[in-house]
Regions:
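Short loop/beta submotifs within extracellular cysteine-rich repeat domains
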Residues: 39-42, 67-69, 108-111, 137-140
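Structural detector for short beta-strands of small beta-barrel domains
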Residues: 1-27, 78-98, 128-130, 156
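Residue-level recognition of conserved beta-strand positions in structured domain cores
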Residues: 45, 61, 103-104, 112, ...
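Mixed-charge, glycine-accented linear interaction segment located at domain edges/termini
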Residues: 109-156
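Beta-strand secondary-structure signal
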Residues: 31-33, 58-60, 89, 101, ...
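Beta-strand elements of well-folded, non-transmembrane domains
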Residues: 63-65, 92, 136
């Protein structure tokens, strides 16, 4: 099981949240377009109400792959293959059962669903290259809003 709840998933993987820049979008749309490093990707936002503001954002990027290779010949990279599909290549920095965190220039949490004839699950330190199934997802980390302390002068 990849997740029991959105909140549980965010709590488990928030340490691997990526920093990016979200672009403006239609109000209420779950499709989030975000620049991660030098790549612009479209992700399905799982942490409604789908109101992540345009501008700087922290998010857990998540995809599921059924096939992968243990190959790092091209180095770390993240590429968009189409709406909500990613090509991920990089070093595995953490593994928890069948979920790995890949350093693809930005952290990407990838759920691996192994095929009977596929390679074994990678371990931390291994290189992996995979293509995620659609839809790749974004779990936006909502930072608490810090309000300035009102001064007596503000009340005049």
């Amino acid at each position: 099981m990849l997740e029991e709840s959105v909140e549980g998933f965010v709590a488990r993987w928030r340490a691997h949240a990526a920093r990016g820049t979200a672009f403006a979008r239609l109000e209420g749309s779950p499709l989030l377009e975000v620049a991660l490093g030098e790549t612009v990707v479209q992700l399905f936002e799982r942490t409604g109400p789908y109101d992540a503001p345009a501008g700087p954002v922290r998010l857990v990027v998540h995809g599921v792959a059924t096939r992968w290779s243990l190959d790092g010949s091209e180095g770390p990279s993240l590429a968009a293959l189409g709406p909500a599909r990613l090509r991920v290549s990089g070093r595995v920095v953490e593994r928890d059962a069948d979920v790995v965190v890949v350093d693809a220039g930005v952290p990407v949490v990838v759920g691996l669903m192994p095929a009977d004839d596929g390679p074994s699950l990678p371990e931390a330190g291994d290189w992996i290259t995979c293509e995620t199934l659609a839809p790749a997802q974004a779990f936006v980390i909502r930072e608490p809003v810090r309000r300035a302390v009102a001064s007596p002068d503000d009340q005049v």
